[in-house]
């Protein structure tokens, strides 16, 4: 097993069990306790855990804010996988809402290159650059105050525009998901309240974000996990930690 893979596995165990022991990890990974201590020291330096006598405990990780442009540039494999899953769950004739996320930005690119015929509503102006005059996608742009940090239109004016519509499906992102409390979070109230209204007008609501966001905290709770119908990430349900599966099952949220 490579070092990075072992570090990821250690964090997964920590998220599941909240604490680990050096001896147990050494036995599990068939390496020396010296190596495990070095691994835990590195993870502590990265702010992922706190070392204790003979082991370590989990630190709750806070989400870090960045602009939409920065997130789009950071076009990771998980984002690509999620974007493709989004397109697979859109059918011809539907009206769909894309929330302001880098994943939805990528999904819009795939949508523009597909043969799908839908109506796309969004409050993220930058995605319109993907669609040319030959596109079969009808685009409705939500107006309102443009937030440069978030990369889209949010706040009371945007909310009033959104209230005028009904959609079949909405794809919403988040900065983090507090699984213990069942809270879905972002960074600030205007964006959060806009997301709430997007959810209010949707028949089916998808939470589309990376697996690593599970257990990360944002600044503002905009929804409960149980308010969503489906969770889309880069992993299949069989690859989730058992404790995570139980939380999603209890919340009656499907995992794709």
Residues covered by each model-derived region:
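Conserved phosphate- and dinucleotide-binding cores of soluble alpha/beta proteins
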Residues: 2-5, 12, 21-25, 78, ...
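Conserved SAM/SAH-binding loop
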Residues: 104
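Short secondary-structure boundary/hinge segments and terminal tails
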Residues: 61-62, 107, 180, 216
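Active-site catalytic microenvironments in core metabolic enzymes, especially phosphate/sugar-handling
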Residues: 125
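Conserved SAM-binding loop
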Residues: 120-121, 187
